[in-house]
Amino acid sequence: MPKLLLDEHLSPNLAEALMKRGVDAIAVAGSPLATLLDEELFAKAADLGRIIVTFNNPDFVAEITAFAAANPNRQVPGVIFIPGKKIRASEISRLAAVIEEVARRIDRGEADPRYGLWVDLG
């Protein structure tokens, strides 16, 4: 199962819900990683071998592409984008289930996060 790194805008409660489902997830929010710039976060994700989970931010795609071009030997394992800008507490369990399924698809080789995977909560 792939390891996940939840971007600073995602609640540590989501990481906890994922861990309860057997998905290795750590949250940037509330940790020393919260002070990192995006480029530093990409480097940390690459070093830790973790897929970044973040909101669907158009700038993020350009930034991670630039990081990959500038660091050909230090690639981020991938990105999972979730829709919206905020997750309500009542949505955490459902979102964790969807992300767990995406992680299982990655694990089975059915999805490739290197180019970004977009989660559908519909």
Task: Describe each PLM feature range.
Residues D38, A46-I64:
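Acidic, metal-binding active-site segment of PIN/NYN-like and related structure-specific nucleases
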Residues M1-E8, P12, A17-K20, L33, ...:
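Acidic, PIN/NYN-like endoribonuclease modules and their adjacent C-terminal/linker elements
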